[in-house]
Every structure is written in structure tokens, then in C-alpha cells.
């Protein structure tokens, strides 16, 4: 028996990192929103690493925050240790990573959902989805039928989830949760193309069973940089991590039992993440390496569980115990939660458009691992965009479309919907051709005005943003106007920085353009420096040092956006365009790009094909 459970503007299926951002964005935009979770205790769960951010991922977190999302704020509230990665490289790849208290993170996120106006939470498994005119009908296992105008699918690894540990395999979700067993069939009946991916996670072990005596200690960075641009106070480092290594004995235990790995025994059909291989995969693929690094990380302030970063596995439990105990510091380790692999259903993202809406199913959106990506941060970014666009569609407002020249979020989405995926997609700085412009320190400059226009940045935060921008502009002007005389004091500073002294007056901006010189170096002579926050000076220094490169990237962006403005008709049949190669015709008909710029990024479409397309488009527009 079924019953009418009510009408909502937007429904979000899944309350992980994608679902949370989707539901909050939708509700905060004024839409009556319902979010479903199989288990209310799984809201905001971090079933893999107890951390937020990392290379390129930290960029995504700051971008979500700049738009008005929640991940950055909550990560700051739950930080145990913070580190800025890649400081030895240029500012384009500096990325923030925080070790978090995973249980606190889940509690805080759940409470934020509970307190959010316009948002209703439901513990229920959605087993059926069907179209009803302009609405969507969602049916739960208990027979509740929800009528919704838009739906966001954020199912994570729950959809058709299957656990693998050695020869043992069973239907299951992450962290011992129930899987969503019937929704995938309903989506297939609807006509959604699904595929199988897989991921894995390491064991959690008992802190008191680890010998930390000879392990390398990894401390957090000082001063701490928060994820959120709205943070009043930065988080504090309250924990450390440890580093250890595998060895020949570890390798031998794994090789002796590799036939028992479901991955190598042919039990797993799903494709795993290329950039996060299991330890047995590392041993097999990189057999020439004598050892592999692992990080021993705390899971929280009120738990004794420790996470073994870099050691995911699907080998049998007794084999896991054996190879973990070959590692320095883990000789007597006790496993609290064993490592496992999980296989799950996800969609082919080539079915989506730039709003993350399914092209052939108006009002249906995908987000996170359901779209073929991996990672909490990638999920949150997509969840925000999908949830915001679902609400904007209901409200009859213009959609939120972020391009790859303006954000890593735009790069992520463009890669998914244009290039597709053959394995779980992971964000990396190398995926952006505009990474010097898309730095994490300027995410607010790029995206907070968009969040304000959406209605997700309130007056208080907007005033704070404008103040920061005014301070940066004032400091840029001061740097150009301030001239230092060639004094002994100045030249002593320059010599200490291993750069040439000066014989004539020199502008502050010119000194900061030198690679060897920083604001900190110039403190003794820059006596008129205003009392601005540290990030103002860091931002100005980066802008000055990389001015030439940034100008060139801005020129590239202008050209890309010129091509993005050349829209392609939705009804176009590329097979009928004379001059296009067969491969280009097939790829263009499959991806259905919205503009010439996107068409040029499709694998298999050459510059010559784009020239043909531009000629055809010009003639087509003239005929009109």
C-alpha cells in the first residue's frame, strides 16, 4: 500500500557531501526541500579518509564556500590539523588540507540541516522514481509517495552497493550501512544509462596498539589558514599525524595472497579510481618500488580509531592483519574496522548538461559519485551546483553555469559532461589550463559576487567581502606609489635575499615582483605598511609576481569565452554536416555540446572539425 507523503519543490536523494550542499542551496534559495537518507546517522559521513581538502580539492572547498556553501565552514569547526600543501611550488597549486574529527563533522552537518528553514529530513530508502507530467514521483520502501518538481540524485556509493573483502561479497553500503538496492533498476527503466565503478578504504586501527616511538611525526602548519572566507577565527592544530612505510615483508605477504584479492580474482567488475589505488594494486603495478608511504591519522578527538591513509585493500581480513603487522609501528596493531572495496552504480555524465540536469529528463539532476566522480570535495561542489539549479528551475530563474575559466567547479563539471569518465574522476590542478588565475586565495573574488547574485551571501558577509576587496585595491595602489630610496638598509635586505642591490629609487611593487623578495623580507624598511590581514599581502604579492603570466591566461580566457558564446542548435544532426570526420560526427552527436568552445574540448574532435563547425554555423545563422 502507498500513501501521499506530500508535495515539495525539490527532493534530494542522499545526504552525503553532495546531498547536503544540494539540499542547503535549494532550501536557502526559498524552495520547499526534502532530503532522504537511508540512515539518519549517515548524514555527512566521511566513510573513507577523515580529512577535507588536498591538492585541487582544497580549491573546490574554498569555491563552494565563496558561493555560499557549507563544507568549508564545517571543516573549520571540526579541524584537528591543518596543512597547506605544495608550498614548495607556485601559488597556483597551493592547496589547503585539514584533518577533521569525522564524527563531529557528521553531527554538525546534520544539525545544520535540521535547523535549515524550508528543509525537511527523512530517513527512508527511495525505491522508485517516475515522471508524472511536469512533476516527479518518488516512492519509498514503506510506500510513501512524494511529489516533487525537481530531483537531485546524490546516491554516493549506496546505489547498488556491494562490499568485497577477500572471497566474501555481499550487498552493502559504506561503513556497514544498508545499500539502495532497487532505485538503480527504476533509473534504468526510466532510460538513464548506468555503469559500475568501485572504490576502497583502508582499515581503522586502535591507537593504543600502535608503537609511535620511531615513527616520523607530521605536524600542522602555523599560522593556520581557514577554508572559509567568512571565518572569524582560524582553526587550531590539536593533533599530529605519523608517517611509516611498507617493506619487503609487506610486499611478500600481499604477493603470496594476491590470488585472494577480489580485484585480481575477477570478482569485481567495477572500475576503480586511477589515482587512489589499493595497496595490492600499488604492489602489482609498481613492483620496482621497494616501499610505499602511509600516513597514520586520527579519526577524531573522542575516539581511539586511527586511519591508515594509503593502505586501502580488499584482501581477506586475516591477510590484512598479516601485512599491516609487517609495517614499522604496526607490529601489534589491532584492526577495529577492516578495509574493504565497494562497488556501486553511477551514471554516464555525458547525459548531463552544464547545470547537471539530465538533458532528456527535465528537472532531474545528478551530483557527486553518482556522476562518476570521486571525493568528498568533488561531491560537495557538484551538489551545490545541482541543488542551486534545481531550485532556480523551480523558481523560473536563470540557471547557475560555472565555466572552466572561472572556477575549478566549472572545470570539474565541464570535464564530466564533455569528456566523460572511464574511472572515478578526481580533481587535480593539472586539469585546469587556467590554474594561475584559479588560485584558492582568490576564490572569493571570482565567485562571491555570483553567490551574492544568487541570494546565498547575506549583507554582513557581502560587506566583509567588499572591505577585503577595498583593502587589496588600496594595497595594490600603495605598492605602485611607494618608492624606497637606495639606502644601506634596503640593500642589506636585498643582499640577504640573494638579489641585486639598487642604486636608484625603486617602487615597492618592483621589489615584490622579484622572485626572491617577499613582504616579510621588506618589513624593516616598509614602515608605512597598513595593518591589514595576512591574506591581503599574500594576494597582492602573488598578483605582482605573476602579473605577466596572469595577463596571458586572461587573454586565453577571453578567446575561450568568445567560442563559448557561439551557441550550437539543440536539434543539430552532426552527421549531416559535410566536412566533419566520422569520429567527430559520432562524438558530437553523443555529447551534444551547447557551444563551439565545449565542442572543441571533446576527445576526438580536431581543430579542423571546429573550423568546419564554425563555417557551418556562420552559414546556418545567415540562412536564419
Where are the regions that the model predicts?
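Beta1/beta-strand and adjacent pyrophosphate-binding region of the FAD-binding site
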Residues: 4-18
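Conserved N-terminal/central alpha/beta ligand/cofactor-binding core
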Residues: 7, 24-132, 142, 150, ...
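Conserved Rossmann-like nucleotide-cofactor binding loop
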Residues: 18, 41, 594
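An anion/pyrophosphate-binding glycine-rich loop and adjacent beta-alpha core
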Residues: 39-41, 84, 184-321, 418-491, ...
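A glycine-rich dinucleotide-binding beta-alpha-beta segment and adjacent secondary-structure elements
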Residues: 307-373, 401-414, 533-587, 592
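Glycine-rich phosphate/pyrophosphate-binding beta-alpha loops
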Residues: 369-377, 433-435
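Internal hydrophobic alpha-helix adjacent to the cofactor/substrate pocket in enzyme cavities
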Residues: 379-400
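Extended, charge-enriched "interface" segments that sit outside catalytic cores
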Residues: 431, 437-439, 443, 448-453, ...
Amino acid at each position: 500500500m502507498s500513501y501521499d507523503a506530500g508535495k515539495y519543490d525539490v527532493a534530494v536523494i542522499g545526504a552525503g557531501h553532495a546531498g547536503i550542499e544540494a539540499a542547503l542551496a535549494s532550501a536557502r534559495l526559498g524552495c520547499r526541500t526534502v532530503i532522504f537518507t537511508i540512515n539518519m546517522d549517515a548524514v555527512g559521513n566521511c566513510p573513507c579518509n577523515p580529512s577535507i581538502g588536498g591538492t585541487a580539492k582544497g580549491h573546490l572547498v574554498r569555491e563552494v564556500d565563496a558561493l555560499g556553501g557549507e563544507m568549508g565552514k564545517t571543516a573549520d569547526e571540526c579541524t584537528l590539523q591543518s596543512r597547506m600543501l605544495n608550498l614548495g611550488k607556485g601559488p597556483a597549486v597551493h592547496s589547503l588540507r585539514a584533518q577533521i574529527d569525522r564524527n563531529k563533522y557528521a553531527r554538525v552537518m546534520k544539525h545544520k540541516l535540521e535547523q535549515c528553514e524550508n528543509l525537511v529530513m527523512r530517513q527512508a530508502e527511495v525505491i522508485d522514481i517516475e515522471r508524472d507530467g511536469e512533476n516527479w514521483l518518488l516512492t519509498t520502501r514503506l510506500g510513501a509517495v512524494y511529489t516533487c518538481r525537481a530531483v537531485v540524485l546524490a546516491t554516493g556509493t549506496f546505489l547498488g552497493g556491494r562490499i568485497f573483502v577477500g572471497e566474501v561479497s555481499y550487498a552493502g553500503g559504506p561503513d556497514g550501512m544498508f545499500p539502495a538496492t532497487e532505485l538503480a533498476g527504476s533509473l534504468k527503466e526510466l532510460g538513464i544509462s548506468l555503469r559500475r565503478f568501485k572504490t576502497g578504504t583502508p582499515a581503522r586501527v586502535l591507537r593504543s596498539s600502535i608503537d609511535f616511538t620511531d615513527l616520523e611525526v607530521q605536524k600542522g602548519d602555523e599560522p593556520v589558514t581557514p577554508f572559509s572566507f567568512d571565518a572569524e577565527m582560524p582553526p587550531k592544530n590539536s593533533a599530529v599525524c605519523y608517517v611509516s612505510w611498507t617493506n619487503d615483508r609487506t610486499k611478500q605477504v600481499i604477493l603470496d595472497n594476491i590470488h585472494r584479492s577480489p580485484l585480481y580474482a575477477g570478482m569485481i567488475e567495477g572500475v576503480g579510481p586511477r589515482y587512489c589505488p589499493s595497496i595490492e594494486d600499488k604492489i602489482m603495478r609498481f613492483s620496482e618500488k621497494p616501499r610505499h608511504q602511509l600516513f597514520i591519522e586520527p579519526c577524531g578527538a573522542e575516539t581511539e580509531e586511527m586511519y591508515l591513509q594509503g593502505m586501502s585493500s580488499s584482501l581477506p581480513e586475516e591477510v590484512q592483519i598479516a601485512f599491516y603487522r609487517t609495517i614499522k609501528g604496526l607490529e601489534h596493531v589491532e584492526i577495529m574496522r577492516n578495509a574493504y572495496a565497494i562497488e556501486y552504480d553511477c551514471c554516464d555524465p555525458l547525459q548531463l548538461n552544464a547545470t547537471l540536469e539530465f538533458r532528456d529528463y527535465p528537472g532531474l539532476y545528478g551530483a557527486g559519485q553518482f556522476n562518476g566522480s570521486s571525493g568528498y570535495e568533488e561531491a560537495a561542489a557538484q551538489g551545490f551546483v545541482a541543488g542551486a539549479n534545481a531550485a532556480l528551475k523551480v523558481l523560473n530563474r536563470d540557471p547557475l553555469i560555472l565555466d572552466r575559466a572561472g572556477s575549478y567547479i566549472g572545470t570539474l563539471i565541464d570535464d564530466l559532461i564533455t569528456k566523460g569518465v572511464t574511472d572515478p574522476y578526481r580533481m587535480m590542478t593539472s586539469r585546469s589550463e587556467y590554474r594561475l588565475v584559479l588560485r584558492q586565495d582568490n576564490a572569493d573574488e571570482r565567485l562571491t559576487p555570483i553567490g551574492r547574485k544568487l541570494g546565498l551571501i547575506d549583507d554582513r558577509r557581502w560587506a566583509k567581502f567588499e572591505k577585503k576587496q577595498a583593502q587589496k585595491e588600496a594595497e595594490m595602489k600603495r605598492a605602485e606609489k611607494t618608492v624606497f630610496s637606495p639606502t644601506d638598509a634596503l640593500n642589506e635586505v636585498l643582499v640577504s635575499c640573494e638579489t641585486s642591490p639598487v642604486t636608484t629609487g625603486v617602487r615597492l611593487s618592483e621589489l615584490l615582483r622579484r622572485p626572491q623578495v617577499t613582504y616579510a623580507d621588506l618589513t624593516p624598511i616598509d614602515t608605512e605598511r597598513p595593518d591589514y590581514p595576512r591574506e591581503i599581502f599574500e594576494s597582492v604579492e602573488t598578483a605582482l609576481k605573476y602579473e605577466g603570466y596572469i595577463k596571458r591566461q586572461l587573454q586565453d580566457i577571453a578567446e575561450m569565452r568568445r567560442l563559448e558564446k557561439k551557441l550550437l542548435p539543440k536539434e543539430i544532426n552532426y552527421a549531416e554536416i559535410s566536412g566533419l570526420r566520422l569520429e567527430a560526427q559520432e562524438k558530437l552527436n553523443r555529447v551534444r555540446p551547447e557551444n563551439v568552445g565545449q565542442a572543441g574540448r571533446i576527445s576526438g574532435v580536431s581543430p579542423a572539425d571546429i573550423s568546419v563547425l564554425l563555417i557551418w554555423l556562420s552559414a546556418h545563422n545567415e540562412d536564419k
